Amino acid sequence: GVMSRGLGDVYKRQDYIKRADYYAWEGKHWDLKRIIRYLPKDYQLLYTARQILISRGYGVDEAIKKVPQKLKNDPGLKYDRLKWRRKKGRVDSSLEILNDIQNTKKYLVRPDKWWKERSIIGRSLLYKKKYNTAYKVVSKHAMSEGPEYAEAEWMSGWIALSFLKKPELAENHFKNFYYSVNYPISLSRGAYWLGRTYEKIGDKENSNKWYFEGSNYLTTYYGQLSHMKVKPQEKFELDKLMFVDDKYEQEFYLKKLVAIVDLLDYLNKDKYTKHILR
């Protein structure tokens, strides 16, 4: 009985620590504040510091000092400190944190959250003409999939090509972007920028290949830019894309998914149609 009660307490403590961590990463500082008292003492100090950082409350420095040494390197605490510094406009001290952390997916816990900070800090560095540092900050994102990964790879390629003037460095980033997206708007963007990259390298064959690829998506901005690169004299031809025969149209409107999209549109809820229309 005593042993199982002791184990139960351990599980309960672990559960509270996990919940506190979840609330902190999600920025839910009210929920976090409510459960801090149920945490073991060391973790109370850690999550009090995180709660103050997230809510931008008073006594930040004092709260961080009180965090026990063994928890000072907690990735969540580092992330909250980074975000706090970035919001205060302290780019240099934000860089100290980014240079100090283990840049692995395992350590970062939520590399997608870190990416948002990297992206904002990267743009600040571009504005200050610190192009090499901006590239390092943006490209060391430690992600391998998802929309944030695609965004990070595109931005890394863009900095490499447009600011560092290193098309060979940009090439892989734009390929990573292209092969991780699905929508025409993104596929055309990836193809166009690969076309530009190969153009800068002086590889006409690959440049044309990617511009042609981009020009398949004429209803998008980058599709039209690609078209202008390979067929500057030809006007846009969307006619072939616009023709639908009557039989196909009738069958199309009988499909269940089409009816759902139609209904969502009618209810002004078309933000939910994106996933169906992919």
Task: Show where each model-derived region lies.
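Residue at a conserved register position within TPR or TPR-like alpha-solenoid repeats
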Residues: 23, 85, 125, 160-161, ...
